[in-house]
Amino acid sequence: MIQPQTLLNVADNSGARELMCIRIIGASNRRYAHIGDVIVAVIKEAVPNMSLERSEVVRAVIVRTCKELKRDNGMIIRYDDNAAVVIDQEGNPKGTRVFGAIARELRHLNFTKIVSLAPEVL
């Protein structure tokens, strides 16, 4: 579960290393975000000489959470970290590579470009 002020790792090569959630896109007063939700975040740590810089406000989609994700078939998936992929206004990733495992639920939420870039889909 991701809430405002939560720090997340960045799972792509867009230039950002760490994000801090500042708002959850969706309903007017959502408290938590889960895998597949879009958030507004600020870049807390970035790689030098890249397109994204520190203190820049971006949109990101959550791809991994430490909180368990229960599927309809009873399977429970839990990751070791909270991670997100930086996206543009159309929902396309800003990076060209995605690192780490990605949940299958992103495919049903129309983030197929992120799923196709991922090395492993759980």
From Swiss-Prot:
- GO biological process terms held by the UniProt record: translation
Chloroplast found in the keyword field: yes
Matching InterPro entries:
Ribosomal_uL14, Ribosomal_uL14_bac-type, Ribosomal_uL14_CS, Ribosomal_uL14_sf
Specify whether Protein biosynthesis is a keyword of the entry.
no
Q: Which Pfam families does UniProt cross-reference here?
A: Ribosomal_L14
For this UniProt record, give its keywords in alphabetical order, as a comma-separated list: Chloroplast, Plastid, Ribonucleoprotein, Ribosomal protein, RNA-binding, rRNA-binding
State the compartments where it is located.
Plastid, Chloroplast
Q: List the GO cellular component terms.
A: chloroplast; cytosolic large ribosomal subunit
Q: Where is this chain primarily localised?
A: plastid
| Molecular functions per Gene Ontology | large ribosomal subunit rRNA binding; structural constituent of ribosome
Q: How does it assemble?
A: Part of the 50S ribosomal subunit.
What the protein does comes down to:
Binds to 23S rRNA.
Q: Which family does it belong to?
A: Belongs to the universal ribosomal protein uL14 family.
| Protein's UniProt name | Large ribosomal subunit protein uL14c
Q: Which gene encodes it?
A: rpl14
